[in-house]
C-alpha cells in the first residue's frame, strides 16, 4: 500500500467535512465554495477552511487562483484516489 495515500486518507478521515467536500466535488466536477456549502449543508466558513487544507495536500485544485470571489474548485486525481481508498475500506469494515 502506498504510504502517501494512507497518510492522506487519514488526513481526510479525521475531519468528516473534508470527505463530504471531496465527495461533493467528485459528484459535481467544478464548484464554487457557496455551491459546496449548499450541497453539503456545511457553513461557508467551514467549507473555505477545509478547501484551503485540501488544496495544501493537493486533493483539490483551484482553477482561478487570482479571483477572490467565484473561485472554482475541482477534485484532483489524487483526491479521487483517496476517496476510492476510503470508500473501499468503509465497505469492507461494514
Residue ranges and their predicted role:
Residues 1-20:
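Short alpha-helical segments that sit at the start of domains
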Residues 16, 28-32:
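Short capping segments at the starts of secondary-structure elements
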Residues 19-23, 81:
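Pre-recognition alpha-helix immediately N-terminal to the DNA-recognition helix
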Residues 23, 33-34, 52:
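Residues within the helices of the helix-turn-helix
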Residues 27, 72-94:
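Conserved segment of winged-helix/HTH DNA-binding domains
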Residues 35-39:
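A short acidic, leucine-rich amphipathic alpha-helix
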Residues 45:
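Key DNA-contact positions within bacterial/archaeal DNA-binding proteins
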Residues 57-67, 74:
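Beta-hairpin "wing" of winged helix-turn-helix
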Amino acid at each position: 500500500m502506498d504510504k502517501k495515500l494512507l497518510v492522506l486518507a487519514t488526513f481526510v478521515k479525521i475531519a468528516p467535512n473534508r470527505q463530504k467536500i471531496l465527495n461533493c466535488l467528485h459528484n459535481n466536477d467544478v464548484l464554487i465554495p457557496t455551491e459546496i456549502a449548499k450541497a453539503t449543508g456545511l457553513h461557508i466558513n467551514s467549507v473555505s477552511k477545509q478547501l484551503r487544507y485540501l488544496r495544501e495536500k493537493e486533493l483539490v485544485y483551484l482553477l482561478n487562483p487570482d479571483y477572490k470571489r467565484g473561485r472554482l474548485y475541482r477534485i484532483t486525481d489524487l483526491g479521487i484516489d483517496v476517496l476510492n481508498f476510503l470508500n473501499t475500506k468503509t465497505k469492507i469494515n461494514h
